[in-house]
Each structure stands twice: as structure tokens, then as C-alpha cells.
Amino acid sequence: MNKPIVGITMGDPAGSGPEITIKALADPEQYSYCRPIVVGDVKVMEQAKKFVGREDIVIHRCEKVSDALFTPGTIDVLHLDLIEDISKFEIAKVSVEGGNAAFQCVKKVIELAMAGEVDATCTNALNKEAMNKALEYYHGEKSDGYTHFDGHTEIYATYTHTKKYTMMLAHHDLRVVHVSTHVSLREACDRVKKDRVLEVIEIANKACKDMGIENPRIAVAGLNPHCGENGMFGTEEIEEIQPAIDIALAEGINIVEKKPTPPDTVFSKALGGWYDIVVVMYHDQGHIPLKVEG
């Protein structure tokens, strides 16, 4: 069977993406797993290989995916002419040009996936400030009228026409999905609503089943210290989270505890194998434990 073709976005050319990509694809072992092709600008990738001291690597310019060689020692780049003058482009600086480049790479790799030209996508880092400056600068002309995205998740949802979605992070058997992500902590608390919590529980259940987990064991983290202590430290668990859990249970979804699990203990249990996935209420509640572990 042919190995899957993986489209890898270059990321913001002022950031770490091009450098990380060169280092990763310089390892021949990657080609035993998949057939990688970078979506980006050849000029940026040529500069990146010099920056990391891998001038032995050949950057192979492709106009279409079928041009790729998929050969160790050669990095295939589906060329998008994104940076006008690479000699004047500043590394580690937020810019409209860099933000637009990063966005166009994501948009293109989604297009390739939707067309079946790549089997999976992998995204390097983009700078949200730079990207949104670019979207606003061009008044949506280079982004189909859109002038703001919070991040990769929202771009993917928009261009795949997906209405119900959330971010998942995974490291081995630790999986996390979020009720909200890139919003202020104050707004994140306001977004803890029954309908959204239920929606994310349902997404988590389906995602685990798609990954081959027959009856996913789900934990739902509370929002407040000790899950609010029966309303003493907040009422979201009583008014929003528990009602969502009750509906999910009635739908046959396996919420192990049948109630919110205290945020300060849910991940010790998850790492101990109690759950297949944890539904968290906001960005850092899920990102911190997963990034510490992974």
C-alpha cells in the first residue's frame, strides 16, 4: 500500500516553521512513514536550510503535488510565490507579508486535502497577529472576504464548511477537547453554556469512535475550583455543565463520572488510564497538562 501523502504548511516565514521543517524532513526515517510535501515558498525554504546548516538538502520545486519525488535528502515544496524579496524579508518580525504567506499556505493545504491530492495535513506555526494584520490590510481580498480568524481551527472549519467543531490535542493516549480556545479567560467563562458543552461532548465521542475507540470513556472537567463546591465558588457546574452531561448520558454517551470532574484531579486520572478523552472548559485548562506531558 502506498504511504500517505502529507501536506505540510511552511508556517510564517519569519518564524520557526521553515527551520523545523528542514530539520524534520532531513531525517530519512520520516519517509518510511509517509510521503511529505511542503506547501510554501521555495525561496524561504532555501534560506531556512542555510540557516540550520543543511545546505546538503535539495529543495525540489513542485508546481503540483504529482511533481514531488518523495526522496530522502530532497524536500519537495509545492511553490507558492509568497515573499517578494527574500533578501529584504526580516526574520522574527511580525509583518503583513509573513502573515499573508502563512495564511495562504493553510488555505492551499486545505484545498489539496479537500481535492484528495493529499491524505493528511500538518501545520507549522503561524503568528495570529501577523495573519490578522494581513487579512485586514488586504480587506479580505486574499482570503475570500474574511478579515479575521482566531487560528488554524477556525480556518479549517471555514474552508471545510464545518459548522460544529472544536480543537483536539493528543499525546499518545491523552486526548483533550476544548469548549473554547482563543478568547480571553473572562470570555471563556461566559462561553461555558449547556448547548456548547453538550456539542463538544458529542464531538469528542464521535472523534474517539473515528479513531477506533468503541465506547469512549469521557471525562468532563469543571470550570471552578472543586467544581464550585455546590455553588459556593461558582454555579456553572450546576447550571450549565451538569445539564449538558445529563443529556449526553441520555444519548448513551459514556461520561465515566456522570458529573463534572474537578479540574485539579481530572488529568491525574486521565494519565492513569481512566479516560480516553477529557472535555475541558477553556484553552489553558487543556493545553497546560498536555504540553507538560508531551
Q: Which residues does each PLM region occupy?
A:
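Contiguous, glycine/small-aliphatic-enriched amphipathic segments in soluble metabolic enzymes
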Residues: M1-F149, R191, D195-A219, L223-M281, ...
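A generic structural signal for well-ordered coil/turn residues at beta-strand boundaries
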Residues: T71, K164, D173-R175
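Conserved beta-strand scaffold positions in the cores of enzyme catalytic domains, especially
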Residues: D76-V77, Y165-M167, V176
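Ligand-binding beta-strand-loop-alpha-helix segment within the catalytic cores
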Residues: L169-R191, D195-L198
